[in-house]
């Protein structure tokens, strides 16, 4: 949780002696509660999270992963890896989704934006946001009411993302973060967007966590030059040179 799903400062109260409370009047993107377990919000069909669901909130915070955790119904049917549920680290036999239509559409949006078709790119983004706003995609309480103040809307055509390439690409990248959170995509996105971008995102994450989690107090920042592994020397040799005698692969400066 680094503030991306909401527009106001977090007011979550954390205290190991009490149940954490959220101010659910703050508008949040509905995808937050599909990706992150929050106190006071139904956790799939397991009910409301309790304080003891998090072993040490002061050390790790009060939020929990959600997308790849099996539901109670899946657990009871044996789909969740029933043989491995005992102990402090339950196992799961649930499949991991490697590629989805959502992922493909947002990758396509990136391609369109890079080729200059900003309207086409934002149409893909708006498709994703329109789906996120559907009632079926809203986490609800037992009585059928929304579990929080959910808000997500399409980008209007007057938005700068429809006319400014940099703004458009920024919007697409944000949408990937919101839509694909906790699905194992993030590192690969940061890697292909470049070392400088990755370093900036990691710094923003650490700076935010330092406000709440003591273990981040002494955290240092990863320089952009160290966000990527060096290219294997043998791979550079195997690729050979082009017609002008220049190598197809070149070792990045920090690793030469």
Language-model features and meaning:
Residues 1-256:
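Acidic/polar-rich alpha-helix caps and helix-coil junctions
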């Amino acid at each position: 949780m680094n503030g991306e799903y909401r527009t106001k400062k977090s007011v979550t109260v954390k205290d190991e002696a009490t149940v954490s409370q959220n101010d659910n009047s703050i508008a949040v993107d509905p995808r937050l509660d599909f990706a992150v377990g929050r106190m006071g919000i139904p956790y799939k069909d397991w009910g409301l999270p309790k304080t003891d669901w998090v072993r040490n909130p002061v050390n790790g915070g009060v939020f929990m992963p959600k997308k790849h955790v099996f539901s109670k119904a899946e657990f009871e049917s044996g789909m969740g890896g029933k043989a491995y549920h005992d102990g402090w680290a339950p196992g799961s036999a649930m499949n991991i989704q490697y590629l989805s239509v959502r992922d493909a559409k947002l990758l396509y949006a990136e391609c369109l934006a890079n080729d200059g078709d900003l309207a086409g790119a934002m149409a893909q983004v708006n498709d994703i946001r329109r789906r996120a706003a559907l009632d079926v995609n809203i986490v609800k309480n037992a009585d059928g009411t929304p579990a929080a103040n959910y808000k997500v809307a399409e980008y209007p055509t007057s938005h700068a993302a429809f006319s400014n390439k940099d703004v458009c690409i920024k919007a697409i990248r944000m949408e990937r973060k919101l839509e694909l959170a906790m699905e194992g995509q993030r590192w690969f996105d940061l890697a292909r967007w470049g070392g400088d971008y990755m370093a900036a995102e990691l710094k923003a994450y650490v700076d935010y966590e330092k406000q709440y989690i003591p273990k981040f107090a002494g955290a240092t920042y990863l320089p952009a030059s160290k966000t990527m592994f060096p290219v294997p020397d043998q791979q550079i040799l195997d690729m050979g040179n082009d017609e002008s005698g220049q190598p197809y692969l070149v070792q990045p400066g920090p690793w030469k």
